[in-house]
Amino acid sequence: MASPRSAGGVGGGGGGGGGSGGAAAGDDAIWSKLREAGFDEESLKRRDKAALIAYISRLESEIYQYQHNLGLVLMERKELTSKHEQLRAASESAEIMHKRERAAQQSALAEARKKEENLKKSLGIQKECVANLEKALHDMRGETAETKVSYESKLAEALQLMEAAHKKFDEAEEKLLLAKSLEAESIRTHNAALRSLHDIDDREDQLRRDRISCELENEAKEKEISLQRKSLNDMKKILHEKEEVLLKEQALLNQRDENILERLAYVTHSEKRVEEEKNILEAERKVLLEEKYKLELKMEAIVSREEALIQKESLLDKRESELLILQETIASKERAEIERLNQEQAIALERRKHDFESEMANKQMSFDAAMEVTRNALHQRECALSEQESVVVQRSQNLDLQLAELASKEKALAGRSDELKEEEEKLLLHREAIHNELQKEREEIQRIKSDLEKEKAFFEEEKREAIQAQQDLAITQADRDELLTLQMKLKEEIDSLRAQKRELMADADRLQAEKERFEIEWELIDEKKEELQKEAIRIAEERRAITEYLKNESDIIKQEKDNLRVQFKSNSETLSREHKEFMSKMQQEHASWLSKIQQERQDLKRDIDIQRVELLNSAKARQMEIDSYLREREEEFEQKKAKELEHINSQKEMINTKLEHVAVELQKLKDERKEATLERERREQELSEIKGTIEALNNQREKLQEQRKLLHSDREAITVQIQQLNVLEELKIDSENKQLSLLQHDKSKLGSDINVKDNHHDNSHSSPKQRFGRKLDLSPVSTPISWVRKCAQVIFKRSPEKSASHDQFVQNGVPKKVGDSVDVEDVNLDFAKVGQKRLNHLVSCDQTEVLEPKRKHRRSTIQKVNGGEITSNCLSALEEKCSKNEHDEAPLGLSNTCKEHEYGDKGPENLTKPGEPASSVDVPYVNGIVDNSDSVQEEPSVEATVSATETSNVDGPEDNNDSDEEDEEEEEEKTSSAKKLWRFLIT
């Protein structure tokens, strides 16, 4: 119950300055009545003042806290809305980028399809190579199946990351809803505070009414005081006994307070244990976050390994650019399978991440549920403590009333009032301790809220990182697709894929081991979760025990309150009696008390004014602090916003640079493809030219083979003709030898038959001259010589000058000698000349063979018949050419000349000296004409032999010199023609 002065002060503060005079007059009247009743004004003022100040400060602090929480909630709402808009903008930009990349990919696929159509036209030539490479690819596909599975798992994990990001976004929206609900709760608490203020006003009105009723009762009791003074002496003894009882009760109260403190210590200990368990849960959460970070590091390692593989593939692309066309076709076939594998891998990654995020979400939900349970328990405890505080306040009010009534007693009761003051101070200290504990609990709640905000920010950062990772995965996915299409273009990729297979098998084993370890850890987490559930059950049981204990305590306090009420009633009755006794003393001391009350009233007004000014100043300072704090928070928020915008701009610039780099790389690849196509066209042209040259060479080869066959046939024909000529030559030499022997025999008979000589001379002068000039070419000796000359002229065409000079020489040689021979001696000399020349020629051949064997093989042999030259080296030259073509080392002409030389060696043995008789077999033949003359003189024969020997000795060296010069010229011509023919064959 408030004092009359405190009630008047509160009413004056609420009513304004207009009713201050009436309130002061009412206060004077009330205090005059109280002084008449015997109440102590100073004690009432002090107690009312302290209670009002404490209550006002508590209400102001609660209102300030509610306003502060409301401001924080509004700021959090603004931050969450801004972050939500940023995330939405980022997602829209990511979708736009994804659409652009998809369009670029579709255009690239269209270009690739066009290239495939163009390349299919050239597959006819490369079918055999493609068949071999398809066999290799069949082996390679079996090896790359496991790599494809790994890629599919990675793609699945990436999709799981995206789903987890969407779930986090949904969780953020749920948290926004929670923030809105908290805002609504704060509004409700504000309304409840306003209602409590209205209740306080109503209570003040009730207190005023109670005060009036008390004053009326006091007036009624003042009449009874005179009657009670008589029993005052008896009551003093009773009061002493009651004081002792009160001391005992105070000791009991102290013991109960100690018990309450012990129970509070136990509650704090249990709360500390709950906090320790919370720290353990935080540590486990950190461990899980570290595991998640390790998984992200592993993902980054896999990405770096993929980049290394991409670099290797680029190097292999540079080395194996010659197989670009074929491998592009292979890459187009394998592109669909690689994309499927990548998708399956992303799905596996997303599934794995989704499982991990779901586990984390379950843990967080369990943790949030535990925190909610603890929060509810703390709220219940706060309510219980508030009820206990209200009980204590009521108790303190009752004690204040009791002390106020006891203060009106005599100075003997001053000791008792002092003890009651000490008890009141203890109760105030206890109430302050309870208030401090409540403040600590509020701070813990605020700290938990801040932790939740931090976790919210952490999850939002994770969401941003997931979105960024998704964008990076989209960019790297496009790059990976392009590079994988280039990867299939390599001839040596089989070996690299096998090595990759081994590495991926090792990675698969490692991931299997990690999976098993993760399952083991998951089982451990489940066990820990079960333990935490058991601990939560135990904590709930403890809370139930605490609530039961608090209920019991509240029942005990209610019982004590009832006891105190009973005691208060008894005390009030005793005090009413004592009041009647002390009325006389109070009237006597009324004058002194009135002056003191006025002084104290002035002091109280001054103190109230000072406190009001201090409260206003403190409120202004607090408002300034709040404004400065809000400005600082706004500045920090603006700075964070600017930093985030800068970070977003930098990320956009990085993405633009990466896109430019990708465009440059694509342009380089296009240039390289163009260069490769140009190189391929150039090589095809070169191949066509080479094929044309090969066909031309084959045609020339066939022509040369035909020419060679013709030359072989010509050589065979010529060799046959040479053999025939050799046979004829031998027959000719035999006939000449016989003729020489006949001539010698005829010369021996010329001396005995002169008449026959004259007749024969006449006939030989008339007919042989004409016959020899007319039938020289028809003789059996001259016919094969002319035929050989014709063959030589056809095969080795001479210059017209040499042929003319040769013909002239023949004509000059033969007809002149034929024309000069008039008589039989000249004719016989001519026959002797012919035979002698043949013999001399054979001897000269033997000498030239001995002297110059090499030149003999190179040079043609010359035969002279009647002063004419016959070339017989044409066959040897032709055989030499044929031997050069067929690499023969033994020409046929050489064998024939050797036969002639052998025959020439035998010739001088068959020749008869002058004076020896000739054989009778050779007589009838003289140059193909039958000679029937049997009588030949001896003297002309001697002259003929001498002249024949002389002419042969004189003409022999000259003819040999001329023939050597002509042979050298002809040999030079033939060697030059042979060289030309050989060069033609080589080219």
Curated annotation (Swiss-Prot):
Give residue spans, biased composition: Gly residues.
Answer: 8-24
Q: What induces it?
A: Induced by abscisic acid (ABA) and drought stress (at protein level).
Its subcellular locations are: Nucleus matrix; Nucleus lamina
The principal location of this protein is nucleus
Polar residues bias spans = 944-954
Q: What does this protein do?
A: Architectural component of nuclear structure that plays different roles in controlling nuclear size and morphology. Involved in the modification of chromatin accessibility by interacting with SWI3C, a component of the chromatin-remodeling complex, to thus reduce the suppression effect of the complex. Acts as positive regulator of drought resistance and modulates root growth. Positively regulates the expression of genes related to root growth and drought resistance.
Q: What is this protein called?
A: Nuclear matrix constituent protein 1b
